[in-house]
Regions:
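The feature captures the beta-strand-to-loop junction immediately N-terminal to the Walker
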Residues: 31-33
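Conserved ABC ATPase "signature" region
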Residues: 61-66, 103, 110-127
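Short coil-to-helix segment of the ABC ATPase nucleotide-binding domain corresponding to the Q-loop/switch region
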Residues: 92-101
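Conserved ABC ATPase signature
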Residues: 132-136, 140
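Hydrophobic anchor residue at the start of the ABC signature
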Residues: 146
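Catalytic Walker B motif of ABC-type/P-loop ATPase nucleotide-binding domains
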Residues: 157-161
Length: 168
């Protein structure tokens, strides 16, 4: 697995220039002060923000290239993301949050639930499945967000301050 990120992303007066490559098995930490573009970079890889120029390529598949009008929808990318603070869908149950990625890929609810069972057990979420996100502690919500990011077996896992507020 290789991720090649060679792009510029512009948002208003902010411009982020990226020229990085990552290989399978690498663990990379992006560090910098507030407002330096760390989350923006992750959002571009996840497909939540389109690149302005350049390209983003994962295993020879172009995910985003403005010049060629190529943009793979975030739900179809082999990328999982855990947002800072979890960011669960408030109108969905915990189970619906966990299986969201599979459902977005047209997998039936019953099959998605079966596929999710291992993660549900590993993360200790069985008792929480019918609850709403507002009923969870910060750590519980973070575990749900991590399970949701892993459910599609992504090639790349992006973590935006995933340990903040995590229960011990």
């Amino acid at each position: 697995m290789t991720l090649d990120a060679h792009f510029t992303l512009t948002r208003g007066s902010f411009e982020l220039d990226v020229d990085l490559s990552f290989n399978e098995g690498e663990v990379v930490a992006i560090m910098g002060p507030n407002g330096s573009g760390k989350s923006t970079f992750l959002h571009a890889i996840a497909g939540l923000l389109p690149v302005t120029s350049g390209s983003l390529v994962l295993d020879n598949q172009t995910l985003d290239e403005a010049a060629k009008a190529v943009f793979i929808d975030p739900t179809q990318r082999p990328v999982g993301i855990v947002f800072q603070g979890g960011l669960l869908f408030e109108t969905m149950t915990i189970l619906e949050n966990i299986i969201f990625g599979l459902r977005a890929r047209k997998i039936k609810r019953t099959e998605a639930t079966v596929q999710a069972q291992t993660l549900i057990n590993q993360f200790g979420l069985t008792e929480l499945l019918q609850r709403q996100p507002r009923e969870l502690s910060g750590g519980q919500a973070q575990r749900v967000a991590i399970a949701r990011a892993l459910i599609t077996k992504p090639k790349v896992l992006l973590l935006d301050e995933p340990m903040s507020g995590l229960d011990t």
